[in-house]
């Protein structure tokens, strides 16, 4: 039996209980394939580092654990799994394009951070405009790390 999860576990409040339940319901020799993001790894080229830091700090609240990959292998082991694989899966957009992950993420972040941590709609909009105008000038850069874990249920 195979369990697949992409960008889900970081949103679960009681992750240890969820991993224990996953271990319980998997058949013997079952496998879990989990991909989650460490949101501290996000990098955008910007002219205003202070604003970028404020926006990304507010964005961290969108997940129950925005840094889950740092502890996920240990949590899987404690839940009874044997961790077979840990790999990095980078997302990299060195140029701006409307069809990229990073462009879609800009709008998600603007919606989420507006009216949090003192960020109003004008500041959030200026943040987004700065990134997109960097793209128009040929100065765009985006990188984000996701992490892949493959864990097996011990016999």
Language-model segments: residues:
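S-adenosyl-L-methionine-dependent methyltransferase catalytic core, i.e., the SAM/SAH-binding region
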Residues: 17, 77, 114-115
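A structural helix-start
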Residues: 12-13
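A short glycine-rich, Lys/Arg-flanked "PGG" loop and its adjoining helix->strand segment in the class I
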Residues: 16-31
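Core SAM-dependent methyltransferase catalytic element
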Residues: 79-82, 144-155
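Residues lining the SAM
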Residues: 5-9, 35
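Conserved catalytic/acceptor-binding region of the Class I
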Residues: 31-97
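C-terminal helical/coil "lid" or tail adjacent to the Rossmann-like core of SAM-dependent
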Residues: 84-140
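Short, small-residue-biased leader/transition segments that mark boundaries at the very start
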Residues: 1-2
């Amino acid at each position: 039996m195979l369990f697949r999860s992409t960008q889900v576990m970081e949103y679960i409040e009681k992750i240890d209980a969820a991993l224990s339940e996953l271990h319980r319901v998997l058949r013997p020799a079952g496998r879990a394939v989990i991909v989650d993001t460490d949101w501290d790894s996000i990098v955008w080229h910007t002219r205003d580092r202070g604003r970028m830091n404020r926006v990304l700090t507010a964005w961290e609240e969108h997940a129950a654990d925005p840094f889950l990959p740092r502890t996920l292998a240990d949590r899987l082991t404690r839940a009874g799994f044997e961790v077979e694989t840990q790999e990095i899966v980078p997302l990299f957009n060195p140029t701006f394009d409307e069809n990229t992950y990073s462009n879609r993420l800009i709008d998600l972040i603007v919606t989420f951070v507006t009216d949090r941590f003192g960020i109003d709609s004008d500041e959030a909009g200026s943040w987004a405009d700065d990134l997109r105008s960097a793209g128009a000038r040929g100065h765009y850069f985006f990188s984000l790390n996701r992490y892949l874990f493959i864990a097996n249920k011990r016999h």
